[in-house]
Amino acid sequence: MAFHNRRWNFTFSCCVVVLLLPLVAARPQQPSAATRVHEEYSTFRVENTEWTFNHLAVDHRNGNVYLGAVNRIYKLSPGLDIQVSHQTGPDEDNRNCYPPRIVQPCSEPLTLTNNVNKMLLMDYRENRLLACGSLYQGICKLLRLDDLFKLGEPFHKKEHYLSGVNESGSVFGVIVSYGDASPDKLFVATAVDGRPEYFPTISSRKLTRNSEEDGMFAYVFHDEFVASMIKIPSDTFTVVPDFDIYYVYGFSSGNFVYFLTLQPEMGGGPTTGSSSAGREQVYTSKLVRLCKDDTAFNSYVEVPLGCVKGGVEYRLLQAAYLSKAGTILARSLGIGPDDDILYAVFSKGQKRRPKESSQESALCVFTLKEINERIKDRLQSCYKGEGTLDLAWLKVKDISCSSALLTIDDNFCGLDMNAPLGVSEMVRGIPLFSESKDKMTSVIAYVYKNHSLAFVGTRGGRLKKIRVDGPTYGALQYETIQVVDNGPILRDMAFSSDQHFLYVMSESQLTRVPVEACEQYSSCNECLGSGDPHCGWCVLHSMCTRKEKCERSSEPRRFASNIKQCVRLSVHPNNISVSQYSVMLVLEAHNVPELSAGVNCTFEDLAEMDGLVEGNRITCSSPAEKEVPRIIVDQGDHQIVQLYLKSKETGLAFANTSFVFYNCSVHKSCLSCVGSPYQCHWCKYRHTCTHDPSSCSFQEGRVKQPEECPQLLPADRILVPVNVVKPITLRAKNLPQPQSGQRGYECVLTIQGVEQRVPALRFNSSSVQCQNTSYMYDGMEMSSLPVDLTVIWNGDFSIDNPAQNKVHLYKCDARRESCGLCLKADPLFGCVWCKGENRCSLKQHCSYPQSMWLEHNGINSKCTHPRITKITPLRGPREGGTLVTIRGENLGLEFSEIKDHVKVADVECTPVPEGYIPAEQIVCEMGKAERSQFAGNVQVCVGECRPEFMAKSSKYYYFVIPQLLSLKPSRGPISGGTIVNITGGNLDAGSNVSIMFKDQKCTYQRRGGQWITCRSHASMQGYGNVSVSVYVDKAHIHKDLKFEYVEDPTITKLEPEWSIFSGNTPLTVSGTNLDIIHTPLIRAKYKNLETINICQVLSPTTMQCMAPELPYSISKHKDVPERPDEFGFILDNVQSVLALNNTNFVYYPNPVFEPLSVSGVQELKPGSPIILKGRNFLPPTPGGNGKLNYTVLIGDKPCALTVSDTQLLCESPNLTGRHKVLARVGGIEFSPGVVHITSDSPLSSTAVISIAGAGGLLIFFIVIVLIAYKRKSRESDLTLKRLQMQMDNLESRVALECKEAFAELQTDIHELTSDLDGAGIPFLDYRTYTMRVLFPGIEEHPVLRDLEVPGYRQEQVEKGLKLFGQLINNKVFLLSFIRTLESQRGFSMRDRGNVASLIMTVLQSKLEYATDVLKHLLSDLIDKNLESKNHPKLLLRRTESVAEKMLTNWFTFLLYKFLKECAGEPLFSLFCAIKQQMEKGPIDSITGEARYSLSEDKLIRQQIDYKTLVVNCMHPDNEKSPEVQVKVLNCDTVSQVKEKILDAIYKNVPYSHRPKASDMDLEWRQGRVVRVILQDEDVTTKIEADWKRLNMLSHYQVTDNAVVALVPKQVTAYNSVNNSTVSRTSASKYENMIKYTGSPDSLRSRTPMITPDLESGVKVWHLVKNHEHGDQKEGDRGSKMVSEIYLTRLLATKGTLQKFVDDLFETIFSTAHRGSALPLAIKYMFDFLDEQADKHNIHDPHVRHTWKSNCLPLRFWVNVIKNPQFVFDIHKSSITDACLSVVAQTFMDSCSTSEHRLGKDSPSNKLLYAKDIPSYKSWVERYYSDISKMPAISDQDMNAYLAEQSRMHMNEFNTMSSLSEIYSYIGKYTEEIVSALEQDDGARKQRLAYKLEQVVAFMSLES
């Protein structure tokens, strides 16, 4: 027994060892790394938000770019790839340390200080870079250009300190070369920041060859009295404390060096700083000139510069650039093309520094020649002794010029007299271009082909391209590009070395922009009309490009550079009817090149035909009949089609013209037919419009002119009273006489939507009459109703009605309840007031005699008993002038009747004609009343003052005396806007009130009995008191009231300068005169939306405000700070504080709270702290001192808080029970859940009894188990003895099986790869593919069809769904909706997947928005996963949330193209290889087991004898075609054979397009006459015991090379012999078979499909009897080998398929494969996951690796590998499915980071690929690494890609149906969703709950 056990163990171990042996196979080559594609728009972004960019320099020799930033200097390639980074800071420093601490110790406190780059210059001579910073008083580094190696950093002399100012735009340097003989000099100019004793403002320095030499940066000349520098005198700071000179630009030209400056004015203007009391400093822009060789700076001259355009002065210099003039501009300026010109950008006015200046700006140009001439004139006049030196900042006192006899030429460099010198008169530049909204901030220019081109950057981040042709020709802005999303473009811009690109810089990014983008223009006119001189039209290539890029551009007319050279095309005829075909057309082409290669004529995508070229004339035909487009009625009577000429040389269309196909039959009326611009004729008797007049029935029936059309003529108003029988006679012309068989005329009146047909009589061709009838309309709301009238004949032939004649039905008694209203009606109506009936009616309807009528203009036409119903106002001043409005009945029909007959309180009241409404209203103006008159009623007489014509009011009118008491406030800003409240008495009297502040109105707003409010205007008289007057009608109310205009308030400081997106954080505002504003408001504007919040004034200099929220819903869900576009205050009408230009106010992301737990309830013990988790709890403010005011309530009790960035620690109050937790901060209120505080308690007696009982049961159970174990042991011993007897029989068969497996391993690879051909891959279309992934198993989903609702509800439902669609597109709503659903217990996993898929179908057309929502949900999911203490690796492992399914769907949408172009091919090859390899051996059709398998579960574990046959099959569609040879097995069932035959015949046909095997019969043809139908089961089927075996080919004894055919399934009995010559008494066993009615589907699913016959109890089997049946005989089992012996076949199959698995894995895990680049979606999502990991400080590479694996490979690729039917139109059998599952498991193991320890007990599918998985893992790791190294995808590029994907597939799903499906969840959880929206602050502000309730109302509406 022991011996047999050892033999068994040895045998089993051998098989396992075979599985673990490595395969002898060639290793796949490693894929090459992805090659980076350089796009034209390259961008280099800041590495750290604090390291903003300052300066830029480009090496014109090699194109390398050098970038000066805060704390860094970078060397970049021309394509902006970083090459070297050099650190310059930060370091410990204090700006008051002089000399700096690196020279000697400093007593000032040191802080870590950033180093701002202030100057970056290329020293070409010494191949080094000068980089000067703000640290240590402005020392400079000299860096080697090649590698930024520090050559020197002189810092120990005072000359080495340029300036301690840390503003990057305040210093400028110019290196001047003097040739090889002399060293270069550095001219440097800098602001000094109030420390002139340390730093000269301008100086010239030495540049030594040795970068470490002491003399580096020494002054060129320096002695006791003279030096090469100028300092600002200290006296200047006495006059202007904040004086400084800011240097904007510098350059050298000729013998001079020039600097452009901005400096405060000394005289005349108010001062700045603390002495200014809020006044604004006036600045002047000046140019400074120095001689290059002047060591004493005697040549220093400065001249003011400015620009005036349209009467507006532009004086604040922003940027400048020196360039050559160029031919065209030079001609306009009167200078040479190589002369220097200076471009300068100025902003409007002279107040404020450039950063705070006006948005209005101008680009101007100066000629250096004119500037130098002006300087020379000034020098000459000064040296004649004229005037003063005019340099107030340098010479505080005016110094007169000294006279000297000398000649001053163009190169005069001054003497030690009359120097330095200023020019007082401004040099005016020539304005070229102005901008009022987006301030220009930078400029650069160059000359291209004689054109001068300026490139201007703006504050809004745009680049403007301007062609400058001078004052004669003007300037043209021909293109604008948005380069930077936020922030201005900085002054420094530079061209690439070849001038093809421009480097544009902001604080956060450097971008390389092409100087031209010709390819954006798609037509010649656009191209040459754009104004870009770079661009021309390459004619035959039909593209806009530079000339050098156009092939053969030098040949005549191949390249157009002028718009007149564009190809022009005309065609004759230029229109034809849609019913004309193959008409010859003649095209004339102008400006075409030689066309010897030939042309085609193309009618868009409708037709194409050859053209015959004869010179510039081309002849071609119009489309043939089948190609002519059919014109739809809704599209009008014509369709314009573009007719193109296509060059046969290039294959491109190069010219086009419009061609019209017209369709006369569209016209349904004569006038529209003959009025058509095309050749349309009207057939009068056929009532049709045609292009062929010969088709009309009669010659006289043809109409071509409008005058000949049958038509109704204009008629007077046709009045018809209702319910009165009356004919309607109409004038007409050309009325046709109905012919034989045609019907007569009818009138059709459409009354309230209902047609009423009336017979009509044609008197002649010019008259028709609608016969006697009566008409009626519903309702009494309308006194008359215009009704459409149509005259028709012959049933539906309508007569044209060009005058739109209508019938006016009317009712006398509608809306005419009184006599006056009745008589006021239109006299043509014939209405009378029937006094007896006291109503308005027609005369004939009044049953009383005429004496009892009143009618308009009749003998008796005056209504009696007028009545007054209302009077306003009821009070007024005695002085009169009050307009009294009297409403009533019967108040006369003419103004003359009441003109002098109105009295109010016995005072004449003069009626006003403009206010009189006959019978209804009188407006009259009150006269002056006597003092004795106090009150009275209103009296009106109509015509005469007899009682029956007189009306008196029941209410009295009173005379009152208005009075004034006081006004408040009594002072306000000079700009106005103050709401003034005036108190008094009777101030609501009268009809009109006006308030005057001296001679100016105070705009009236509201009033009551004791108050009036008005808004003050800006004062025209200046500061001081003004008298206040009030007028009520003609009464002037006297009171000595004064209002004082005072100086406008100012804002000087704001603390803190930040808030959160939701606002409502307290801000302290400092300023002046704040107490004069009674309702101050603070405002923010962002993305064109404005929000405001309240402020409270505390003192004249202080107020407290609550920050407004950032008014843009998307910003609330961002995780990056945002700056508002405008931030300021609404202080009455003070404009200067409306938008503060000097604030750096920033908004940080809102704090985000997480739920306390998944259930929302957290269990706590008393005294335990409550921890609220989230993020952004501490805004990342500069200095790190940003704190928010949090309030946390437990129930209604606050708790003490400790705050960190991600946690709020709340010391819970002494409470027990359940309490809601509520957190408040800023404008946010959030409840993270409920805490349940429970105290500990000892075990109850019940619990003790329960525990004791459970213990007793456990002991009893253990005893029972021991007894059972003993009995089982005995049975095992007996079984073991039986096994030993079988071992000897099995041993001999092991060797044979292993030998066969090895042979298959060596021979099958070649056979399989040769069988697979490159047939077309049956990809599913996009819609089917996405539906199978989104909604697996659902074939006809509602989202694929139109919404189906009952007709009566359609309109309401569609309205509701449109509103619902708007809500889904609101991010606040959608996120709240998803979160609410996920929090519901009844919301199942299936529901989550369904909702995610439905949302993605709705958002298919808005993938940018869908991506944003997905990122937000994933971010939430990550936060929740980490906070729930789950292991981070579990993230995205399963699909338990909407976000996870949305992620799958997102990849499904975006990877379709990649599947089709790249990954689909190896996946399809693998599927085919598996299918083919499986079918080479037996497959059990019942169990699905196979001889060849990768899955142990689907392996036939016994020896099956089989033989391969070849059958010749007739093609079912064409029996005459050659027979198809098909390999089958003699052990195949009939259904399996049918499937193999169909596979062979329809090899390249998608599975859904080929016949079903179940619809076909297999016919075995024996000779010409005998045909036997084969079946899986028939009367010959063998049944043994209770087992029935399916028929196989061996059962029917089918031989090799047998002829078979697939024929449609017959309805007669199966398996009958078709042999007319065989005797009916034949003994054939196939005769007289009964019809089989239970035939199964012939393995359409190819899964085990035949189940036991339930009626007979017979079990069906094929090759192996199912192991689940326990009645197998012992002998049957004994005939099998030990099943594990056959595991070697797994290895053989694996070896055969290895190449295909490797190909698939290599394709998926390569960043570039088969010519396809990595899909953007993968890079974008992986970067997002990395960002999230960084955010949560997760640096474990295994976690990051696992996140990415769970995100893409395990979520998308595994699904696709296991289910290739999602991608291809194929069928997947159960054995193929099992094999693919093994491949998928291997794929999953390859993505795992954990080590798999394998042994003999491990699953076979793990052992199978154990040796390959380490290699696959390395592929995955390299793949993730390569992706992380690739350049990040910008949001702009990703959004463009997503928009394109949306556009391509935007109509795949029915949005209405999708919305309807989503709405079903609204219906289920309405209350919960509405509640969540009401609790969400953002949703409340947008009233989303209300909008949802509107949707619910529409959707639930029943009628």
UniProtKB/Swiss-Prot annotation:
Q: Name one Pfam family in it.
A: Plexin_cytopl
Q: Which family does it belong to?
A: Belongs to the plexin family.
Question: Where do the PSI domain residues begin and end?
Answer: 517-567, 663-710, 811-864
Membrane-crossing residues? 1247-1267
Topology Cytoplasmic: residue spans: 1268-1903
Stored Gene3D superfamilies: GTPase Activation - p120gap, domain 1 (1.10.506.10), Immunoglobulins (2.60.40.10), Phosphatidylinositol 3-kinase Catalytic Subunit, Chain A, domain 1 (3.10.20.90), YVTN repeat-like/Quinoprotein amine dehydrogenase (2.130.10.10)
Task: Tell me the membrane topology, using the record's own terms.
Answer: Single-pass type I membrane protein
Query: Mind listing the UniProt keywords for this protein, alphabetically?
Result: Cell membrane, Developmental protein, Disulfide bond, Glycoprotein, Membrane, Receptor, Repeat, Signal, Transmembrane, Transmembrane helix
Q: Give the SUPFAM superfamilies listed for this entry.
A: E set domains (SSF81296), GTPase activation domain, GAP (SSF48350), Plexin repeat (SSF103575), Sema domain (SSF101912)
Q: Which residues form the IPT/TIG domain?
A: 866-960, 962-1046, 1049-1148, 1151-1246
The residue ranges of the Sema domain are 27-515
Q: Where in the cell is it found?
A: Cell membrane
State the species of origin.
Answer: Danio rerio (Zebrafish)
**Any ranges marked Extracellular in the topology annotation, and which?**
27-1246
Q: Name one GO molecular function term.
A: semaphorin receptor activity
Disulfide bond residue pairs? 97-106, 132-140, 291-413, 307-364, 382-401, 518-535, 524-566, 527-544, 538-550, 601-620
Name of the molecule in the record: Plexin-A4
Tell me the name of the encoding gene. Answer: plxna4
